[in-house]
């Protein structure tokens, strides 16, 4: 009999999250321990999720039972930039449910987080994984693990047939599939298959628990929230990206050197990404807009600053699959190093299954609005239209 694709308890340990949540959490502990934030869930489709509210609440309540184990702490201690005081903080950390508010608002599922940034930062990824898996339990009860494995092997066979040996030797891929996975067991199976059978270079996973389980490198640096929060953390708005990057440099001293570029837009980011930052950071991550146009802007920027693009890396993570990744690899080969973070296409691509398009984004910091504009207008998220207009005015965004 086939193993069930679903587990009764969806999130079973504290490290079943994306690595960049921990790297940002450490930076928040050291720099902004008193910052207050608000987050909001959004389903970008018209799907009605309200029938699942009771089960979602039950799974959220079970998060409060989790604590980090000695073995998990030992794994984190081996990462050179994870500091002893942060390890001690994690040893005491528990999910505090008073910061989570669920319900139905305007006929739609509502999830809000309000509280200290340090204590709500880890909720985002498990909440998204819970919503996704609860919904999939109801809609796709008959799906088997073998179906997910078969689909993934078809993709690996395609890549093996399509790419040359030389291309495969340099083709770097990481799993970024935690937040919108079909289920935990599908992601676990996918990472196991990729480690064992990926024909290119499987460099790791964003999921800290799975990195530990399969002896892989945990992958991730910063998310949009890091740059967004700095819009209300003290500096002038025009200096917010500079402040976010500078704080990151002081925290990690050259480690974790991939910067995210589309909190405002790529053009606004590059205006702040001067020679100092361009030398200090190892590269950039793409998460919206046309990836090739973005890459050309990045390469031109490095060249303008007198930096060899081949000393830098571009990480792509926006809605990728293997064919898109291979096209980008071929287009940029020999010009700049590239790596690909593939998410939903690895962990929720099963025949007959419609993946969810859900996010939880920061909407306020210290009682004031924050926003992400991005290089794809549909990805803008902020409840305050006046603040979005002001942000665009300050950064001279014309879209």
Curated annotation (Swiss-Prot):
GO-annotated biological processes: NAD biosynthetic process via the salvage pathway
EC number in record: 6.3.4.21
Positions where Phosphohistidine occurs in the chain: 224
Coiled-coil spans in chain: none
Record GO terms (molecular function): nicotinate phosphoribosyltransferase activity
Family matches, as InterPro entries: N/Namide_PRibTrfase, NAPRTase_N, Nic_PRibTrfase, Nic_PRibTrfase-Fam, Nicotinate_pribotase-like_C
Modification after translation: Transiently phosphorylated on a His residue during the reaction cycle. Phosphorylation strongly increases the affinity for substrates and increases the rate of nicotinate D-ribonucleotide production. Dephosphorylation regenerates the low-affinity form of the enzyme, leading to product release.
One Gene Ontology cellular component annotation held by this UniProt entry: cytosol
Protein keywords: Ligase, Phosphoprotein, Pyridine nucleotide biosynthesis
CDD domains cross-referenced by the UniProt entry: PncB_like
Protein's job: Catalyzes the synthesis of beta-nicotinate D-ribonucleotide from nicotinate and 5-phospho-D-ribose 1-phosphate at the expense of ATP.
Entry similarity comment: Belongs to the NAPRTase family.
Name of the protein: Nicotinate phosphoribosyltransferase
């Amino acid at each position: 009999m086939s193993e069930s694709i679903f587990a009764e308890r969806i999130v079973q340990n504290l490290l079943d999250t994306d690595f960049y949540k921990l790297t940002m959490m450490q930076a928040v502990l050291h720099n902004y321990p008193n910052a207050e934030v608000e987050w909001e869930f959004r389903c970008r489709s018209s799907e009605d999720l309200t029938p699942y509210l009771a089960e979602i609440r039950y799974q959220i309540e079970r998060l409060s039972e989790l604590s980090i184990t000695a073995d998990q702490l030992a794994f984190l201690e081996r990462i050179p930039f994870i500091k002893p005081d942060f390890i001690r903080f994690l040893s005491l950390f528990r999910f505090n449910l008073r910061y989570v508010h669920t319900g139905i608002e305007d006929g739609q599922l509502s999830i809000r987080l309000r509280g200290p940034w340090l204590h709500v930062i880890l909720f985002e990824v498990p909440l998204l994984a819970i919503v996704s898996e609860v919904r999939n339990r109801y809609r796709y009860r008959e799906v088997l693990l073998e179906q997910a494995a078969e689909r993934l092997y078809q993709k690996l066979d395609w890549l093996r047939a399509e790419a040359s040996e030389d291309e495969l030797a340099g083709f770097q891929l990481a799993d970024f599939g935690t937040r919108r996975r079909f289920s935990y067991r599908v992601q676990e199976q996918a990472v196991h298959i990729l480690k064992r059978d990926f024909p290119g270079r499987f460099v790791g996973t964003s999921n800290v628990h799975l990195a530990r389980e399969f002896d892989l490198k945990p992958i991730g640096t910063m998310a949009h929230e890091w740059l967004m929060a700095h819009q209300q953390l003290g500096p002038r708005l025009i200096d917010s990206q500079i402040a976010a990057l500078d704080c990151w440099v002081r925290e990690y001293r050259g480690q974790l050197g991939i910067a995210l570029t589309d909190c405002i837009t790529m053009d606004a980011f590059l205006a702040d990404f001067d020679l100092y930052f361009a030398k200090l950071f190892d590269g950039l991550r793409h998460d919206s807009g046309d990836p090739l146009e973005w890459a050309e802007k990045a390469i031109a920027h490095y060249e303008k600053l007198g930096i060899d693009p081949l000393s830098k890396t571009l990480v792509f993570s926006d809605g990728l699959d293997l064919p898109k990744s291979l096209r980008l690899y071929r287009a940029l080969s020999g010009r700049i190093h590239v790596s690909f973070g593939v998410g939903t296409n690895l962990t929720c691509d099963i025949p007959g299954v419609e993946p969810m398009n859900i996010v939880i984004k920061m909407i306020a910091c210290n009682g004031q609005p924050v926003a992400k504009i991005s290089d794809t207008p549909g990805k803008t998220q902020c409840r305050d239209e006046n603040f979005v207009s002001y942000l665009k005015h300050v950064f001279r965004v014309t879209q």
